[in-house]
């Protein structure tokens, strides 16, 4: 595992962009609320059915650690934004720990690491794997579980996505990062928790909760991280 480098001195759909998060050194994360892309599936039902067979096969992640030598106070004190990467591949343990920090299930009733208004939990994390030991390149959905802890990945799209991920935010760092995480939010799910009244601000707030959790987790793991809110929505949909 690479060591952390010292840093120099009105939405129209239920799913919309929120935030971009990058993990640097040996991990990068993107946080988004992503647009739905169901129209593509309708164009080729047969191909969609074939993809579903691939999607439903879960990959179990290593059990997350519940303690470390770094206190919360120490992580907050030393947390800094970083923008440089090493070429070292990530491990499944590191990636799983970061995903768990963002949206891991911590209670049998579905409670997660990040709080949610009325326990709606509208966020979903997606991982773009570029250089992770034991994991093929592609886009994966994180499955934390609902009323039981699952902590799994499911393949959504295979292949090298470095270029398109980098283009979506206009930064080369995204192309070089071993891993990218999208934070997505379901606005309709949150609205249902409020008697079908839109409450998008809570989704944005929760994306911030998840991002901060990952910031502190990255610090504890000796990884760097940067959050970014600027991205090209149309290119994000292509991922």
Protein language model features and the residues they cover:
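N-terminal Lys/Arg-rich, disordered targeting/topogenic segments
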Residues: 1-13
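Glutamate identity and glutamate-enriched acidic tracts
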Residues: 3, 50, 73, 87, ...
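Intrinsic low-complexity, intrinsically disordered segments enriched in polar/basic residues
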Residues: 3-6, 60, 201
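Short amphipathic alpha-helical "recognition" segments used for binding
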Residues: 7-10, 38, 44-46, 216
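N-terminal amphipathic, basic helical "cap/leader" segment at the start of enzyme domains
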Residues: 15-177
